[in-house]
Amino acid sequence: MLHGEAIEALIVGGGAVAARKARALLIAGARVRLIAVEVGTEVRELAGAYPKLHFEERSYASSDIGNAQLVLASTNDRGINRRVADDAHAAHRLVNVADDPARGNCRTTATHRAGDLVIGITAGGVPSAAVRIRDSLAARFDDRYAAAVATLASLRRRLIDGGASDEWARASEALIDDRFCERVEQGTMESEAAQWG
């Protein structure tokens, strides 16, 4: 997974797939430039909500790669997607190709977020399967897990910053064992973690 706030991304395409990929990058904090002959309503709405999204309605040019670290080819034209991928490879950039994942050198994930817990799913180039799996996992890994992760992160910081890294090692071994999910789902993680802090 990428730390979005440090990423400048280029998306070529303006439809639903491009909008979905843009949304994920924007939520992660990336700066996104989108080029498309025609930009759909979803992209326009995203641009209104996220100042880090800039779009241009025009044809793609090889020079659009520019300083982008991540390039996403998301048009409904295989030829354009192939050209975008070739240009990105020539510029030594990470590239994702929506209609031909093997042509790219990275994949995007169907992502579920609950606080600082982030679960990313890929499914061999079958995005609808990844989405179905993500939705199934999201039903279980909810705000209870977000709270547990926040509690553990706070405990870890407190112990390590206080010079007690050995104590953190023992605490994490005790709290993040085979009963971790059981503790979270029964609501006992916070009280058990408090015994270590």
Regions found by a protein language model. Name each.
Residues 6, 66-68:
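Alpha-helix C-terminal capping/helix-to-coil transition sites in glycosyltransferase folds
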Residues 29-33, 68-78, 116-125, 139:
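Short beta-strand and adjoining strand-loop segment in the mid-core
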Residues 70-76, 81-107:
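ADP-ribose/adenylate-binding Rossmann-like module
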